[in-house]
Amino acid sequence: MANIRKTHPLLKIINGAFIDLPTPSNISVWWNFGSLLGLCLITQILTGLFLAMHYTADISTAFSSVAHICRDVNYGWLIRNIHANGASFFFICLYLHVARGMYYGSYLQKETWNIGVILLLLTMMTAFVGYVLPWGQMSFWGATVITNLLSAFPDIGDTLVQWIWGGFSVDNATLTRFFAFHFLLPFVIAGASMIHLLFLHQTGSNNPTGLNSDADKVTFHPYFSYKDLFGFTLMLVGLTSVALFSPNLLGDPDNFTPANPLVTPPHIKPEWYFLFAYAILRSIPNKLGGVLALLFSILVLMLVPMLHTSKQRGNTFRPLSQILFWALVADMLVLTWIGGQPVEHPFVLIGQVASTVYFALFLIALPLTGWLENKALNWN
């Protein structure tokens, strides 16, 4: 008699995705981040749900309700610290997951890759509206500055901004709708993740060599289920360590001050995981140009599959492309540093150079290098 997990309508879907899934036997630890992102999402949804039970989305009580969660709710301080730092771990895993996809040429699975870029945008949007909810100084001014960027669009800009605000400034209506979006979007992300997995399982996973691995595949369980479990343990130890020992390490001190529309903080900046995009935005003197550069800094990922010129899939056997990949990583670190610095010399110039290098690597250097490597190997 056939096993129930292979015949039951629901269990056979789970079986095909997590148990009997044929998996390349040589995938490295860089392939762990997909499951870690799933864990991050579940952690964020659960901690967020418990926070939402005690939070009030009203400008007169939002800040106090967060303080109340930390002081009076059982383990509220822990739930809040895990949720706040969970976002940082989420983005660390996201950026490493994208970097793995770029290094090993996983972007050639176009449907999976494009859904992934949409997931990245959705996650960034969720994190942005979530940062506004505690209604501290940086929450308020971050919301004001970033939403105001939409006014750069010709004709419809001002109307668009007021429509998003629900009034003539960031106010109660803004906070209420941002809370609604912050609650809703993680479930949209969960749904999009299912589609991401569906597309991935149409083709199967890539592997570090970039070659077809059909001849050498193993079942996902027990080999990679235990490998994922090991990754879960490491990440949860890291997350709880940060949440317990230095919960405010990655936050902004300005957010301990309740929002005040009459006092502007000296340096308005987003959370650390958005600093690279913020640096690109600031490096262009024109408002509309900055907004478009900000958008394109993420959307450029959608062009990567189209700009792939090499006859080889990954960077494993392509030393020149490896150098450029690590140059891109270094460039993103420079942009992250610049995003947190004040707008003055020499930071402005460094930001402009780093932004130019960022787009030049994606649009010119990487495609050109792929073509050059083909020539060097006589692969016309």
UniProtKB/Swiss-Prot annotation:
Electron transport as UniProt keyword: yes
Keyword Mitochondrion: yes
Binding of heme b b566, residues: H97, H196
UniProt xrefs under PROSITE patterns: CYTB_CTER, CYTB_NTER
List of residues binding a ubiquinone: H201
Binding site for heme b b562: H83, H182
InterPro entries: Cyt_b/b6_C, Cyt_b/b6_C_sf, Cyt_b/b6_N, Cytb/b6-like_sf, Cytochrome_b, Cytochrome_b_C_euk/bac, Cytochrome_b_N_euk/bac, Di-haem_cyt_TM
Domain of life, per lineage: Eukaryota
Gene Ontology MF, one: metal ion binding
Keyword terms: Electron transport, Heme, Iron, Membrane, Metal-binding, Mitochondrion, Mitochondrion inner membrane, Respiratory chain, Transmembrane, Transmembrane helix, Transport, Ubiquinone
Membrane disposition: Multi-pass membrane protein
Location in the cell: Mitochondrion inner membrane
GO cellular component: mitochondrial inner membrane; respiratory chain complex III
Cofactor: heme b
PANTHER family (UniProt xref): CYTOCHROME B
Quaternary structure annotation from Swiss-Prot or TrEMBL: The cytochrome bc1 complex contains 3 respiratory subunits (MT-CYB, CYC1 and UQCRFS1), 2 core proteins (UQCRC1 and UQCRC2) and probably 6 low-molecular weight proteins.
Additional facts recorded: Heme 1 (or BL or b562) is low-potential and absorbs at about 562 nm, and heme 2 (or BH or b566) is high-potential and absorbs at about 566 nm.
Family: Belongs to the cytochrome b family.
Function, in words: Component of the ubiquinol-cytochrome c reductase complex (complex III or cytochrome b-c1 complex) that is part of the mitochondrial respiratory chain. The b-c1 complex mediates electron transfer from ubiquinol to cytochrome c. Contributes to the generation of a proton gradient across the mitochondrial membrane that is then used for ATP synthesis.
Name the record gives this protein: Cytochrome b
Species per Swiss-Prot/TrEMBL record: Acipenser transmontanus (White sturgeon)
